[in-house]
Amino acid sequence: MAVQFILCFNKQGVVRLVRWFDVHSSDPQRSQDAIAQIYRLISSRDHKHQSNFVEFSDSTKLIYRRYAGLYFVMGVDLLDDEPIYLCHIHLFVEVLDAFFGNVCELDIVFNFYKVYMIMDEMFIGGEIQEISKDMLLERLSILDRLD
């Protein structure tokens, strides 16, 4: 499996989005412990002088990017190619930005169901499904009109 989980949290560690594609989803306590550990690991890093890739466990590495006050994190297999996932984090944020018109944390909080809809269009079962921003926005506008 490629993507094991996708997280989004703010500088204070408040989780705004979480989607598990592996065994963490079945154990809430294990999920909470993993999120706390990920937050401590990422928030303590010097983002100007350290890379966006961190080894997390024996089988998982974290790929993250900070946008304003939000961290977007993907947990991927240890042997996967980091830049590809970093580009997909950026694509996800670009699609959010285009869909909401200059997205902010409050958009994610109050429209979380739309954000999960966007995530579902991009990732299915931990695999990347769509890489075209235009195609994603076209599909999302159709789905949004159904609302």
Curated annotation (Swiss-Prot):
Q: Which InterPro entries match?
A: AP_complex_ssu, AP_mu_sigma_su, Clathrin_sm-chain_CS, Longin-like_dom_sf
Give the subcellular location.
Cell membrane; Membrane, Coated pit
Whether ATP-binding counts among this entry's keywords is no
Q: Name one GO biological process term.
A: endocytosis
Recite the UniProt keywords alphabetically: Cell membrane, Coated pit, Endocytosis, Membrane, Protein transport, Transport
- Bilayer disposition of the protein: Peripheral membrane protein
**Per the record, what is one GO cellular component?**
nucleus
Q: What is its main location?
A: membrane
SUPFAM superfamilies in UniProt? SNARE-like (SSF64356)
**Keyword Zinc belongs to the record:** no
As for what it does, the entry says: Component of the adaptor complexes which link clathrin to receptors in coated vesicles. Clathrin-associated protein complexes are believed to interact with the cytoplasmic tails of membrane proteins, leading to their selection and concentration.
What's this protein's family per the entry?
Answer: Belongs to the adaptor complexes small subunit family.
Subunit details for this protein?
A: Adaptor protein complex 2 (AP-2) is a heterotetramer composed of two large adaptins (alpha-type subunit APL3 and beta-type subunit APL1), a medium chain (mu-type subunit APM4) and a small adaptin (sigma-type subunit APS2). Interacts with APL1.
Miscellaneous field: Present with 1390 molecules/cell in log phase SD medium.
The molecule here is called: AP-2 complex subunit sigma
Which species does this protein come from?
A: Saccharomyces cerevisiae (strain ATCC 204508 / S288c)
Coding gene?
A: APS2
